[in-house]
A protein has these predicted regions:
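Catalytic-pocket segment enriched in acidic/His residues
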Residues: 6, 76-206
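Active-site microenvironments in enzyme catalytic cores
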Residues: 1-122, 203-205
Length: 206
């Protein structure tokens, strides 16, 4: 989708999320102590239903078992795509998934609306039809020389409207206004008419 695909001009790029970082609907999400700039990313996740390797792009849709919503909680502290990117994406409760897995063959994987609210205010409003590289391209790219297993998930990337999108920065990367970033007590909802609503409250880390 728009934001992540700015990184994908030469083809799909990806990073791994640790399964131990997962959270689900209703879970409190811990504000990472390593940053003061916590962001949200509304995404759609496809759930793999078959063990595959080196799958062709045109053969990927039958591999999909179902769909769920995701919030790719992110740290925005002068992070670039590289080793530090992994650090910014993996922390306890840092991958929101839910509220359930929808199994429905009538769903078009390239026409799933997804949006996000913070404290009731709509911040993101997108659709998987905005993906520059479709699910088949991602599946073919990821499964080349790497086996995908049932239960694995691939996330779509996020539409425009994240906090990091919202405000201009100084040449040194300092934000002129950080008010769009999340704070403890904020309630964040990822929503889709096809997949439900994933709701989490941000809390201070223990």
């Amino acid at each position: 989708m728009e934001t992540i695909n700015k990184l994908q001009a030469g083809g799909p790029k990806y990073f791994m999320k640790d399964a131990r970082a997962a959270s689900t609907d209703g879970d409190p999400v811990r504000y990472p102590a390593r940053t003061t700039l916590m962001d949200y990313e509304a995404e759609v996740a496809v759930v793999i239903g078959k063990q595959v390797r080196d799958v062709a792009a045109g053969d990927f849709t039958p591999v999909i078992y179902g769909y769920t919503l995701a919030n790719d909680w992110s740290i925005r502290s002068n992070v670039s795509f590289g080793p530090d990117f992994q650090y910014s994406k993996n922390f306890d409760t840092g991958t929101g998934l839910g509220p359930w897995i929808v199994v429905d063959e009538s769903i078009d994987p390239l026409d799933i609306p997804v949006g996000l609210k913070v404290n009731g205010e709509v911040r993101q409003d997108g659709n998987t039809d905005q993906m520059v590289h479709d699910w088949g391209a991602f599946g073919a790219h990821l499964s080349r020389d790497l086996t995908l297993y049932p239960g694995d998930m691939i996330l779509s990337g996020t539409p425009k409207g994240t906090a990091v999108d919202s405000f201009k920065r100084e040449p040194d990367g300092t934000f002129l206004d950080d008010s769009a970033f999340l704070k403890p007590g904020d309630v964040v909802e990822v929503f889709s008419p096809l997949l439900g609503t994933l709701t989490n409250e941000i809390v201070k880390a223990d």
